From Swiss-Prot:
Database matches in InterPro entries: RNase_HII (IPR022898), RNase_HII/HIII (IPR001352), RNase_HII/HIII_dom (IPR024567), RNaseH-like_sf (IPR012337), RNaseH_sf (IPR036397)
Protein name per UniProt: Ribonuclease HII
Any one GO BP annotation for this protein: mismatch repair
Entry's EC annotation: 3.1.26.4
Subcellular localization, as worded in the UniProt entry: Cytoplasm
Keyword Magnesium recorded: no
Note describing how the cofactor binds: Manganese or magnesium. Binds 1 divalent metal ion per monomer in the absence of substrate. May bind a second metal ion after substrate binding.
Domain RNase H type-2: 33-224
Keywords tagged on the record: Cytoplasm, Endonuclease, Hydrolase, Manganese, Metal-binding, Nuclease
Molecular function in Gene Ontology: manganese ion binding; RNA binding; RNA-DNA hybrid ribonuclease activity
Main location per the UniProt record: cytoplasm
Binding, a divalent metal cation: 39-40, 131
Length: 224
């Protein structure tokens, strides 16, 4: 039986410094040699998929500058994206679309995408560190949820970068198809420009999340 736990490191430690590899090293000393960090991007937007990534870093080839993707510039994220994919022992990405999110809910969709990217790793994980409070079910190995994990673990930080860059690129592609919404700029979040485009053109079936406010009440009858 695997042990799953939640660890709120933010209550014990200051989060003002860079994430590190200490948690992974501790697990490796216990025999969990392949430790995967897992994170998601896209829980809150009105449009687009939720994207998750799992990364197993090589302890001897950890890219410099790994941090929570939200704290990095566009150029930093894209540089690290390539460095992570080149140096990691394994990396995996999974996403679930707006329709699936509407059919279940964002929490369930996120956890399912996390589960898929974990089992999709080319090198099987011996242990998984998941950012946040929730752990996917039916995993092939033990797991720990780390609150603010992307600020503590470089493996989770690496996963956050892979997920962020991947999702941003997906939304940029969507913006080339649906040119009136500015998707390449706000990547689906509820900015003023996005809400104005929704008022003018309406939501895009298959891309917008009809289960999210403010779309839920206004357009719920539009979904077949």
């Amino acid at each position: 039986m695997y042990v799953f736990c939640i660890c709120d490191l933010s209550k014990r430690f200051s989060l003002s410094f860079q994430p590190n590899f200490l948690c992974e090293l501790g697990l490796q000393k216990q025999g969990f040699f392949h430790v995967a960090g897992v994170d998601e991007v896209g829980r809150g937007p009105l449009a687009g998929p939720v994207v998750t990534a799992a990364v197993i870093l090589d302890k001897d080839r950890i890219p410099d500058g790994l941090n929570d993707s939200k704290k990095l510039s566009f150029l930093q994220r894209n540089r690290l994206y390539h460095e992570i994919l080149q140096s990691a022992l394994a990396a995996s990405i999974a996403s679930l679309c707006a329709r699936t999110i509407d059919q279940s809910n964002i929490r369930k969709a996120t956890l399912e995408a996390m589960r898929r990217c974990i089992i999709g790793l080319a090198v099987p994980a011996h242990y998984v560190l998941v950012d946040g409070r929730d752990i996917p079910s039916e995993l092939p190995c033990p797991a720990m949820a780390l609150i603010k994990g992307d600020q503590r673990s470089v493996s989770i930080a690496a996963a956050s970068i892979i997920a962020k860059v991947t999702r941003d690129r997906m939304m940029e592609c969507a913006g080339q198809v649906y040119t009136n919404y500015g998707l390449e700029k706000h990547v689906g979040y509820a900015t003023l420009a996005h809400r104005r485009a929704l008022d003018k053109y309406g939501p895009i079936v298959g891309l917008h999340r009809y289960s999210f406010a403010p779309l839920k009440e206004r357009y719920r009858n539009d979904v077949s």
